[in-house]
């Protein structure tokens, strides 16, 4: 299996892909848009994309989900353990500047504050590790993955420096073809969809009433403006259950009556860590 990810080798996206899909070929992309493009053009390619973090919230890929409408095959709740990486021989007392992605810096803010370290934002965690490795400067460090330390020959100066020791990022596996697991009443599933409402009073209230009447549990609802306007919005919605469950079917049929556009993005097994 080929899996594309945003960033450079050593990123958390690549780490998650390798841990969940043993033997997969990982391919680095400069942007999230490039990930979506590659997966849209080749059914043998999957994209692994960070969707949200338990501590710092949404990553910001929702517009690309709307734009490309790839199918979601799986979700993975991946433990993010941040590590302070320095050049060989450096000690924490030597460090002045720390480089990483804005979210990694935010998620490790207490460690940075307690050690009087200066946070410097860069595009990604693995890129920060590569930068520190290239400088060979003992006063610089990066916050990145264990994989990054191996790739860029850096020492792990301190492990698990994140504020929340149960720091999790939700990754989505997406691809071109439609696939969904067979319905089993003993399994937990998530149905993901996007929709655009008709322009009428109380449209959202009316559209969502079907979920309440049928006893279906909404677990996510986000709104995003349609391109070039603030008067029309798309909604990204996730429902607890399989689309073949009658109460989910009835809820979506009711929703469709109030929509100009509705598209199911995928049905997939709920990650075992979702309830933790």
Regions from the language model: what does each represent?
Residues 1-276:
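Domain-level signature for soluble enzymes in the chorismate/prephenate branch of the shikimate pathway
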């Amino acid at each position: 299996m080929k899996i594309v990810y945003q960033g450079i080798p050593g990123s958390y996206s690549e780490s998650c892909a390798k841990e969940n899909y043993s033997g997969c070929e990982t391919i680095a992309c400069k942007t999230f848009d490039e990930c979506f493009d590659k997966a849209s053009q080749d059914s043998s390619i999957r994209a692994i994309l960070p969707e949200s973090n338990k501590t710092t919230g949404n990553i910001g890929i929702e517009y690309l989900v709307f734009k490309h409408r790839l199918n979601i095959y799986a979700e993975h709740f991946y433990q993010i353990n941040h590590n302070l990486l320095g050049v060989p021989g450096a000690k924490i007392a030597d460090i002045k500047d720390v480089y990483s992605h804005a979210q990694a810096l935010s998620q490790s803010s207490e460690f940075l504050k307690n050690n009087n370290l200066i946070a410097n934002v860069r595009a990604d965690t693995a890129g920060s590790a590569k930068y520190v490795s290239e400088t060979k400067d003992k006063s610089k460090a990066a916050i990145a993955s264990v994989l990054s330390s191996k790739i860029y020959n850096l020492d792990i100066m301190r492990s698990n420096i994140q504020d929340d020791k149960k720091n999790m990022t939700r990754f989505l596996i997406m691809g071109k073809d439609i696939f969904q697991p067979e319905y089993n009443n003993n399994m937990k599933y998530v149905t993901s969809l996007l929709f655009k409402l008709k322009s009428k009073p109380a449209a959202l209230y009316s559209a969502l009433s079907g979920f309440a009447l049928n006893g279906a549990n909404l677990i996510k609802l986000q709104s995003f403006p349609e391109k070039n306007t603030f008067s029309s919005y798309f909604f990204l919605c996730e429902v607890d259950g399989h689309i073949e469950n009658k109460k989910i079917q009835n809820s979506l049929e009711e929703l469709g009556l109030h929509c100009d556009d509705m598209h199911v993005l995928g049905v997939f097994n709920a990650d075992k860590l979702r309830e933790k």
